[in-house]
Structure formats: C-alpha cells, structure tokens
C-alpha cells in the first residue's frame, strides 16, 4: 500500500507539470484502472478529496483558501482524466 501511495503522489506531481494535458498524461493509467483493475471511477474523486484534507491538515494556516481552491481544481482534473477511459 505504501508503494502505491508513493506512486499516487508522484502522479500528482506529474499533473502539476502537465496541467494543460491531464488526459494525455493519465491516458495509460486511465486505461489500466478501467480495463484491467475495473476500479470504480468515483474512487478517483474520493481519493482527491482525501488528499486535499491531508494537505490541509499537514500545512495548516499555509493551506489558504486560494491554495485549497487550486488543489481542488487539480485533483478534480486528475480524477476526470483518470475516468476518461470510462466515458
């Protein structure tokens, strides 16, 4: 589980580097999660929400409303990109 968590966090780093092409960045992962793992795409949204909560807890006052909004927008974009193969 820890190794998968590390991969997930690295993928969010990739998202930040590729905000203008999230669907392309996550195309292979979308295919993997849809075709092979049969993951419920709602879980991508849930994971994003959990990540926002964890970051808010970790950064405290530094996690301003502006940072929260940007983070939520990014995790929503990642969730949408991961769910792309399902559409």
Curated annotation (Swiss-Prot):
Entry comment describing in which tissues the protein is expressed: Red blood cells.
Molecular function per GO: haptoglobin binding; heme binding; metal ion binding; organic acid binding; oxygen binding; oxygen carrier activity; peroxidase activity
Residue positions where S-nitrosocysteine is found in the record: 34
Domain Globin, first and last residues per copy: 1-87
Keyword Nucleotide-binding in record: no
Keyword Heme: yes
Signal peptide: none
Residue numbers of N6-acetyllysine PTMs: 23, 85
InterPro entries to which the protein is assigned, alphabetical: Globin, Globin-like_sf, Globin/Proto, Hemoglobin_b, Hemoglobin_oxygen_transport
Binding site for heme b: 4, 33
Gene Ontology annotations of biological process type: hydrogen peroxide catabolic process
Keywords: Acetylation, Heme, Iron, Metal-binding, Oxygen transport, S-nitrosylation, Transport
Superkingdom of the organism of origin: Eukaryota
Cited PROSITE patterns: GLOBIN
GO cellular component terms listed in the entry, alphabetical order: blood microparticle; haptoglobin-hemoglobin complex; hemoglobin complex
Function: Involved in oxygen transport from the lung to the various peripheral tissues.
Subunit structure: Heterotetramer of two alpha chains and two beta chains.
Record family assignment: Belongs to the globin family.
Name recorded for this polypeptide: Hemoglobin subunit beta
Source organism per UniProt: Dasyurus viverrinus (Eastern quoll)
């Amino acid at each position: 589980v820890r190794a998968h968590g590390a991969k997930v966090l690295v993928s969010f780093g990739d998202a930040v580097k590729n905000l203008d092409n999230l669907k392309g960045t996550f195309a292979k992962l979308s295919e993997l999660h849809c075709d092979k793992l049969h993951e419920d795409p709602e879980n991508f949204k849930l994971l994003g929400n959990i990540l926002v909560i964890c970051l808010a807890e970790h950064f405290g006052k530094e996690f301003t409303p502006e940072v929260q909004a940007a983070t939520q927008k990014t995790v929503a974009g990642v969730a949408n990109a991961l769910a792309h193969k399902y559409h």
